[in-house]
Amino acid sequence: MAAGMKGKRSRRRKERKNVEHGCAHIKSTFNNSIVTITDSVGNTLSWASAGGLGFRGSRKSTPFAAQMAAETAAKTAMEHGLKSIEVYVKGPGSGREAAIRSLQAAGLEVTLIKDVTPIPHNGCRPPKRRRV
């Protein structure tokens, strides 16, 4: 190892992309919410999840956790110059509407909201019903 580089990791500085329009992909499951903001091609600008923000257990699946995840992802994406987004929502979770409202409140102009939840043509057998 070089004498001056001992104990230091070389880390590339994150480059600031200049993107005006992008896409927000919200995946809201029964257990978690993940918000990924990409440019129009599909390259990720920022992402955040409810679990990554410190929400654990049943608090991870709340609308408030999804709202915080969307806010965090939006702030990071707006540093890249993002102004307007198309929103693609996937999954049956409770954080869908909260995440969309949070993106609008963060100052992003929402141009499209589309539900892209995959629906099986009678594929896999669903999990058994819970008896509480």
UniProtKB/Swiss-Prot annotation:
Listed A to Z, the keywords are: Ribonucleoprotein, Ribosomal protein, RNA-binding, rRNA-binding
Show the GO cellular component annotation of the record. Answer: ribonucleoprotein complex; ribosome
Hey, which family's this protein in?
Answer: Belongs to the universal ribosomal protein uS11 family.
Organism annotation: Clostridium botulinum (strain Loch Maree / Type A3)
Function of this protein?
Located on the platform of the 30S subunit, it bridges several disparate RNA helices of the 16S rRNA. Forms part of the Shine-Dalgarno cleft in the 70S ribosome.
Protein's name according to its UniProt entry: Small ribosomal subunit protein uS11
Q: Where is the composition biased (Basic residues)?
A: 1-16
Entry superkingdom: Bacteria
Annotated spans, Disordered: 1-20
Keyword Ribosomal protein recorded: yes
The record's PROSITE patterns line, in alphabetical order, gives: RIBOSOMAL_S11 (PS00054)
- Where in the chain are disulfide-linked cysteines found? none
| Gene name tied to this protein | rpsK
Check the UniProt entry and state the signal peptide residues, or none. none
Q: Which InterPro entries match?
A: Ribosomal_uS11 (IPR001971), Ribosomal_uS11_bac-type (IPR019981), Ribosomal_uS11_CS (IPR018102), Ribosomal_uS11_sf (IPR036967)
Among NCBIfam families, the record links this protein to: PRK05309.1, uS11_bact
Pfam families from the xrefs? Ribosomal_S11
| Molecular function in Gene Ontology | rRNA binding; structural constituent of ribosome
State whether it acts alone or in a complex, and with which partners, per the record: Part of the 30S ribosomal subunit. Interacts with proteins S7 and S18. Binds to IF-3.
Gene Ontology biological process? translation
- Which Gene3D superfamilies does UniProt cross-reference here? Ribosomal protein S11
